[in-house]
Design a protein with these regions (language model features):
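Extracellular "leader-to-stem" segments immediately downstream of a signal peptide or signal-anchor
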Residues: 1-276, 447-513
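Short glycine/acidic-rich loop motifs that flank beta-strands on beta-rich extracellular proteins
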Residues: 77-78, 97-98, 117-119, 232, ...
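Extracellular beta-strand solenoid repeats
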Residues: 87-89, 94, 100, 107-109, ...
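Extracellular beta-strand/beta-solenoid scaffold signature
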Residues: 124-144, 148-149, 165, 244-256, ...
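Gly/Ser/Thr/Ala-enriched C-terminal appendages of enzymes
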Residues: 372-511
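Low-complexity, Ser/Thr/Pro/Gly-rich disordered linker/stalk regions
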Residues: 512-649
Length: 649
């Protein structure tokens, strides 16, 4: 079937995105600012300063690894703000306490997330495996809060600021400068609470409070420009600001003293917890917490942890983080395996497997944007804004065939969660069901997605009416562009931004069936890698969402015939290429799988470094084409019994 067309965002004849706006100017926001450094920037490779090897089989490694982290933390920063990485050699590391990064510019890197890589084995008392946090108690930047009495507030004078706007007007620009970090503070009033119909929440005969009047919804932004009394923001606002409901008291505050960790990362690790078949209130082991700015985590497999991944701050990327929960969670109150709280957060090519859990749940008052891109969820869990007015969530090409997506009013659930999310989008998703509701004065959109719409009443108010249904646009028919985030990123920063985050150039491919076939992932060799060790090639590939690894022969010995991937200039192709050398040695003749000293010669292309089916995603009626170019040198002689020139898995 041909791709559908959204009424709300579509490409015109020149390929430029066109946005439909409401009568008041609200529109789907530009989500492309989510991610490390504001989106479209390659996750950095930070050279290792120290390498750590496993201790004895059951010996605790916490202090051993932490000492290495502390030593690197004491090094001076380079021009890019990095001190260095601690590299964990392959092996199993028993840890009974958290590993903590508390200083800017430090990276903890393993040697792979599969069982033969670097494995953190959790034991001991309740703790999180890895924590990135400077230990300073601070505002998350995007939260419900109360104004400090000594802060200078500047009045915002607009009568209405639509969702998606980059601009606002203030009474006085003196003292403001381009580059200032600011907070836009929207007061919560009794008038607004009543308008949202959140003033009558009751549970078990007791009144419940949604958001207390006098609190503030706070959006953290940076000043990109000043035009008269108009402030141009670096990132659009993901909520509307109506002076009628704020008592004309929305304010702007300069917040240049936010003290967060910066330029920290966690990479290429496996975290293993004992099975936790308990209520999440009794959970012992959590995988990762990152509270910072311009930080990242990538290529991490977390097994049997609970409430696994928590993020706070802004401009953070999580890439290829996989959470696998096979021990069934007990109880009605469920853990959230991804809890992204803050702004400009990108969760890219991640996955969760488990039942009776929240795949994703946001905290209160988050003011985004928060993006889940090409993520997969296996089980009966759901994705929610969850509670107390979080805005600006994009689910882009997310696949949860057994679960659901909810943009809804939770009423008196929890302690009065009420309206959980607004101004949020599910774009070209697949889910079993959607609860898409529309809060007063706002929108939620489900566009180009497949799955059943399930209208509901407000919980604990079953005699009340079914709540208004949000926008379902081109339902059951995927729309172009295939990815909203990637299309917005390309329009804002160009093709190079897509390649920088591992999605490569988008070019038309011929097809006898489909005219709208596009290539969305690719990799070419970089001349900068010529002559470098294969580990540099490995990191380059992983930064683009690919992978390369050298494996010993089945006897588990190291390669005695050299490294088998390098980058060089090919005179025939007139470009830099990856050169793969197949094993061929009389000491290791080809044979059947598993024989001692056998060496199955191969170069493989896989959907992921593990074998879980859901890492290679596709939508109904979507064609997929995978191709690569290679040249076999003249005189190439494979051995006679077994040889893979290229293998696609």
């Amino acid at each position: 079937e041909p791709m559908g067309k959204s009424q709300w965002v579509y490409s015109d004849a020149n390929g430029k995105l066109v946005y439909k706006a409401t009568k008041r100017g609200d529109r789907i926001i530009d989500f492309s600012h989510a991610g490390y450094k504001g989106g479209g920037v390659t996750l950095p490779y930070v050279p290792a300063k120290l390498t750590v090897h496993p201790l004895g089989e059951n010996e605790d490694c916490t202090d051993y690894i932490q000492k290495a982290i502390d030593m690197v933390s004491a090094l001076p920063k380079d021009a890019d703000g990095f001190r260095g990485a601690v590299l964990l050699a392959p092996g199993r590391y028993v840890c009974n306490r958290s590993l903590q990064i508390m200083t800017d510019g430090v990276v903890l890197r393993g040697s792979g997330s599969d069982p033969s890589g670097s494995v953190i084995v959790m034991t001991g008392d309740k703790h999180t495996a890895i924590v990135v946090n400077n230990g300073i108690r601070q505002r998350a930047g995007n939260r419900l809060g109360e104004a400090a009495p000594d802060e200078k507030s500047i009045k915002v004078t607009d009568k209405y600021i639509p969702a998606g706007s980059y601009r606002l007007t203030v009474a006085d620009v003196s003292g403001l400068s381009v580059g200032d970090n600011i907070e836009i503070r929207k007061p919560v009033t009794e008038k607004w609470i009543k308008y949202m119909k959140m003033n009558d929440l009751v549970r078990d005969g007791k009144p419940q409070t949604w958001i207390k009047a006098g609190r503030q919804l706070i959006a953290e932004r940076t000043i990109a420009g000043i035009e008269g009394n108009t402030i141009v923001l670096s990132v659009p606002l993901v909520d509307s600001y109506d002076a009628k409901f704020t008592d004309d008291n929305t304010t702007l505050v300069v917040a240049n003293n936010v003290q967060r960790l910066r330029q920290c990362g966690v990479e290429n690790l496996r975290i293993e917890s004992p099975a936790q078949a308990v209520n999440h209130g009794k959970a012992l082991y959590y995988a990762l917490r990152i509270y910072g700015e311009d930080c990242w985590a990538k290529d991490i497999n977390a097994l049997e942890t609970m409430e696994s991944i928590g993020v706070g701050g802004r401009r953070i990327t999580l890439q290829q983080i996989n959470v696998i929960r096979r021990a069934l969670h007990q109880g009605a109150s469920k853990p959230a395996e991804f809890a992204p709280n803050g702004g400009q957060i990108l969760i890219d090519r991640c996955s969760v497997e488990g039942d009776n859990i929240w795949f994703v749940a946001l905290g209160a008052g988050q003011t985004g944007p928060i993006v889940f891109l090409n993520c997969s969820f296996k089980g009966n869990g759901r994705i929610e804004g969850h509670q107390r007015w979080s805005t600006g969530l994009l689910l882009d090409n997310c696949n949860l065939p057994g679960g659901g997506i909810d943009f809804k009013n939770r009423g008196s659930m929890g302690s009065g969660h009420g309206w959980g999310t607004a101004w949020s989008v599910a774009w070209n998703c697949l889910a079993k069901s959607y609860v898409n509701q529309i809060p007063p004065g706002t929108y939620n959109w489900v566009i180009g997605s497949k799955g059943e719409s399930t209208p509901l009443r407000r919980p604990f108010n079953q005699s009340g009416p079914t709540l208004p249904v949000g926008v379902f646009d081109s339902h059951d028919t995927p729309v172009a562009p295939q990815s909203l985030y990637l299309a917005q990123l390309k329009e804002r920063l160009g093709e190079s931004a897509l390649q920088a985050i591992g999605y490569g150039p988008t070019v038309q491919l011929p097809s006898p069936v489909r005219s709208d076939y596009t290539f969305q992932g690719g990799m070419q060799a970089s001349r900068e890698l010529a002559g470098k060790d294969y580990r540099a090639i490995h990191e380059y590939m992983r930064a683009l969402g690919w992978d390369y690894s050298e494996h010993p022969n089945i006897s588990k010995n190291d390669h005695y015939d050299g490294v088998h991937c390098e980058v060089l200039f090919d005179a025939t192709l007139q470009q830099y290429v990856f050169k793969f050398t197949n094993h061929a040695n009389a000491r290791a003749l080809d044979s059947d799988r598993g024989r001692l000293l056998s060496d199955r010669q191969r170069n493989e292309m896989k959907s992921q470094t593990n074998h879980d089916w859901y890492h290679l995603n596709g939508n109904w009626n979507e064609w997929q084409r995978l191709e690569w170019k290679f040249r076999i040198p003249k005189g190439f002689q494979p051995t006679t019994k077994f040889c893979h020139l290229h293998q696609l898995k």
